[in-house]
A protein has these predicted regions:
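Residue-level marker of positions within ordered structural domains that often coincide
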Residues: 6, 19, 37, 112, ...
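Positively charged n-region of N-terminal signal peptides that target proteins for export
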Residues: 1-3
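N-terminal signal peptide c-region/cleavage motif recognized by signal peptidases
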Residues: 14-16
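N-terminal module-boundary/linker segments of secreted carbohydrate-active enzymes
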Residues: 20-43
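Domain-level detector of nuclease and nuclease-like folds
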Residues: 31, 45-212
Length: 212
């Protein structure tokens, strides 16, 4: 019994130490996460009946989030003295995130770790998204395409002068191209991704779902 209590105490101390170490504003770089909207719909959104997945939206890569990162690992759910965003502030992100529901969760998990206020975090995320040119070639995808994830990386690199291959990574899930993740300095310039972030899609080929 005593050993059990000591183990619980040690775990509590470790969690407290972790929370204390994840201070708001203490990070090395950002990951700008861009979701292929149709893939998110196929994996999650359709089952929810999310309006983001309605036909005719024409959404391609939408903003998933702007995530503070360490060179190894990442902070999350940090303590901050900043207030949470209002409903109006989260709703205002719908144009770049595909819908309003995601914005508040992104603030809670990642935004609080940025050291910024909620309005400034959303402004920074929006600016990061604005600075990246989305490859226009994918806007016309009208049927499922099977291709290597590296083809999409190549398109981003061609559309964004200065973006190098070690500054972008693709993810996939259930055989679908899921996200493009681009690594940025705190000033939103391109930079090399940490080793734990470079996790390219391991599939030889994956499916790019058609634009809805």
């Amino acid at each position: 019994m005593r050993l059990f209590l000591l183990t619980i105490a040690a775990l509590c101390w470790a969690n407290a130490a972790r929370a204390e170490s994840e201070r708001a504003g203490d990070f090395d770089y950002y990951v700008l996460s861009l979701s292929w909207s149709a893939a998110w719909c196929a994996l999650e959104g359709d089952s929810r009946g999310d309006p983001q997945c309605d036909a005719g939206r024409g959404l391609t890569f939408v903003l998933h989030g702007l995530w503070p990162q360490f060179e190894d690992g990442w902070p999350s759910f940090c303590r901050t003295g900043e207030r949470d965003p209002t409903r109006a502030e989260t709703a205002a992100m719908a144009d770049v995130m595909g819908g309003a529901g995601l914005a508040f969760y992104q603030w809670k998990k990642h935004g609080r770790c940025s050291g910024l206020s909620a309005p400034d975090y959303f402004r920074t995320a929006r600016e990061a998204y604005r600075r990246v040119t989305l490859p226009k070639v994918f806007a016309d995808v009208s049927r499922p395409l099977t291709l290597p994830a590296s083809v999409i990386e190549d398109a981003f690199i061609e559309a964004n002068p200065g973006l190098a291959r070690d500054q972008i990574t693709m993810t996939c899930e259930d055989g679908l191209i899921q996200e493009a993740r681009i690594c940025l300095t705190p000033e939103l310039g391109f930079r090399r991704c940490g080793d734990d972030t470079i996790r390219d899609c391991r599939l030889k080929d994956a499916v790019l779902e058609p634009v809805r």
